[in-house]
Amino acid sequence: MRFRPCIDIHNGKVKQIVGSSLRDEGALAEENFISESDASYYARMFRERSLAGGHMIILNKKGTPEYEASYGQCLGALKAYPQGLQVGGGITAENAHDFIDAGASHVIVTSYVFSNGYLNMDNLEKIRDAVSPEHLVLDLSCKNCDGVLTVMTDRWQKKTELELSEELLDKLSEYCDEFLIHAVDSEGKSKGPQKEVLDILKDFSSRKVTYAGGIATYDDIRMIGELGNGRIDITIGSALDIYGGHLDMDEVICLCRN
């Protein structure tokens, strides 16, 4: 079990937000924390602790001025910690290698692959071929829609016709190196992880999986470690001390390693 750090960038600033509140219109989101430091500050912090494999997400819509501001922050962080961070947000087969060349270890993809509500195999194969599976993370972030854990796209605003399941993970494993799963209903709320999501991930072992969403206590971390027998890596955002929360990051790191 590893602790995977995160850097969420919105409107050119490092933030922690309530995931379900994101709106492209007006570039709005409910904010838990806005940092006075830039993304490279956090990248250096993670590099000093040898925390590889963290994810950095641009939470603005591609093609907007806000995206460009966030993109600049992203490049600064990659320069500060080359090969230490995975990057998501506006990634396509056409620009994926630009992020790899800039220092990302992996690119993280959702909307490009799950377009118009369905799995787009042509796009999946294109991006796999562009960067190779070894540099690709598929984000299967999900939300409970009428009792079904539904894969969400476009900064968690649009639902697909796909249900998160071990069968879906198995089907996609040959195309990627890892999976990232945000439990959108829990993201940014610090009210505990979403057990129904973890129950799907707990026995999956074909690829590395990182869970994010709602982790708020050290007991939450222990529970995930026990449930997944150490196979599920975790990300903590709003509850972490570096983002204004109450969990000490160094203690979290030690707990995950032990």
Roles of regions detected by a PLM:
Residues 119-130, 222-258:
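C-terminal helical cap(s) of enzyme catalytic domains, especially alpha/beta-barrels
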